[in-house]
C-alpha cells in the first residue's frame, strides 16, 4: 500500500539465488490481484511510460518475469472509464539494448476512445494509433492485437458511433502511423465514411475489401483496393452491388469497377483526377443503363436515361 495505491492479493517469487544477477529476465512473479487500485504515478517509478494522474482498478492473475509476463483473465478499469477484459502478454517493458517492447492481447472486450487510450500510454499508444480513430468516439473492440514499436497485427471486430468494422490487417512502419504500410481485409457494416473522411457528399457504406497500401489521411492515402461494395451512399443516392479493383493515390483513382445497381449498370476502366474543381476523366466505360435523374446527376427527368460507350 502507498499513499495512492492499494493492493489485496498474493505475491510469490520463484527463483534460484543466481537469478538475482538478471532479475528482470530470470525471477518469476506469480501475483494474484484480488482487488487493486494502482496509481499510474506509482507505476512510473518502475516503467516511465504511463500517463500521469491515472488510476487503474485491476483484477488479474499475473505470471512471468518483469520482461515477459502475462496478465491472465484481466479485468481493468481506469478512472477515465476505459475498460479492458482479456489476456495480455507483455515483453521487454524493462528491456535493454535489442530487447524491444512487445504486446500480444486477446481481448474479450476493450472499451475506450482514441483520447483515453492516449492517456494510458501516451508515447506508445499515442504514436501508434492513427489520428483518424479520434472520429470514432468510444469504441468496443473484440479480438487480437499484436503490437511493437514497428508493427501492428490486428484481427478485430469494432463497434463505434460511426458503425461496425471488422479487420484483419498487418501494419508496418508505424513510427509515422498516419503513413503506415498496411495489408489485409477490411469489412465495414453501415459505416459512416463521410464523417471519417470529412466528405459531406459521402454517407454510410457496407463493403468487403482487400487492401494493400499506405496512409490513413486524404493527403497520404495510396492503396490498392479489391472487393465488393454492397452499399455506398454518394450524392444523395445509395449505390448497391458494385465490384472494384483499382488503386487510390490522392487525388487520383485508377482502376476498374462494375456496377449492377438497378439504376446504374456499367463497366468502367480508367483514371479520375479529383484535384481540380472541374474534374478530369480518362476512361473507357460500357453503360448498359444509367438513370442520371435518380442518381442526382441531372435535374430534368425527361433526359435522364443514358446508355452507350
Tell me what each language-model feature is.
Residues 1-309:
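Interface amphipathic segments
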Amino acid at each position: 500500500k502507498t499513499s495512492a495505491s492499494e493492493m489485496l492479493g498474493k505475491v510469490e517469487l520463484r527463483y534460484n539465488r543466481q537469478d538475482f544477477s538478471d532479475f528482470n529476465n530470470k525471477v518469476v512473479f506469480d501475483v494474484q490481484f484480488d482487488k487493486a487500485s494502482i496509481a499510474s504515478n506509482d507505476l512510473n517509478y518502475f516503467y516511465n511510460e504511463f500517463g500521469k494522474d491515472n488510476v487503474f482498478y485491476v483484477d488479474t492473475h499475473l505470471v512471468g518475469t518483469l520482461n515477459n509476463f502475462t496478465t491472465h483473465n484481466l479485468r481493468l478499469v481506469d478512472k477515465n472509464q476505459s475498460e479492458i477484459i482479456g489476456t495480455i502478454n507483455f515483453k521487454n517493458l524493462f528491456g535493454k539494448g535489442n530487447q524491444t517492447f512487445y504486446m500480444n492481447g486477446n481481448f474479450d472486450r476493450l472499451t475506450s476512445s482514441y483520447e483515453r487510450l492516449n492517456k494510458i500510454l501516451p508515447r506508445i499508444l499515442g504514436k501508434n494509433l492513427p489520428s483518424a480513430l479520434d472520429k470514432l468516439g468510444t469504441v468496443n473492440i473484440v479480438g487480437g492485437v499484436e503490437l511493437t514499436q514497428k508493427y501492428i497485427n490486428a484481427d478485430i471486430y469494432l463497434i463505434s458511433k460511426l458503425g461496425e468494422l471488422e479487420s484483419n490487417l498487418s501494419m508496418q512502419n508505424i513510427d509515422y502511423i498516419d503513413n503506415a504500410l498496411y495489408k489485409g481485409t477490411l469489412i465495414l457494416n453501415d459505416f459512416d465514411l463521410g464523417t471519417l473522411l470529412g466528405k459531406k457528399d459521402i454517407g454510410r457504406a457496407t463493403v468487403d475489401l482487400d487492401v494493400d497500401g499506405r496512409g490513413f489521411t486524404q493527403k497520404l492515402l495510396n492503396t490498392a483496393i479489391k472487393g465488393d461494395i454492397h452499399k455506398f451512399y454518394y450524392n444523395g443516392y445509395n449505390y448497391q452491388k458494385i465490384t472494384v479493383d483499382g488503386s487510390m493515390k490522392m487525388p487520383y483513382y485508377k482502376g476498374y469497377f462494375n456496377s449492377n445497381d438497378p439504376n446504374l449498370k456499367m463497366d468502367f476502366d480508367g483514371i479520375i483526377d479529383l484535384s481540380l474543381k472541374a474534374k478530369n476523366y480518362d476512361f473507357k466505360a460500357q453503360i448498359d443503363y444509367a438513370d442520371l435523374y435518380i442518381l442526382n446527376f441531372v435535374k430534368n427527368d425527361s433526359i435522364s436515361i443514358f446508355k452507350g460507350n
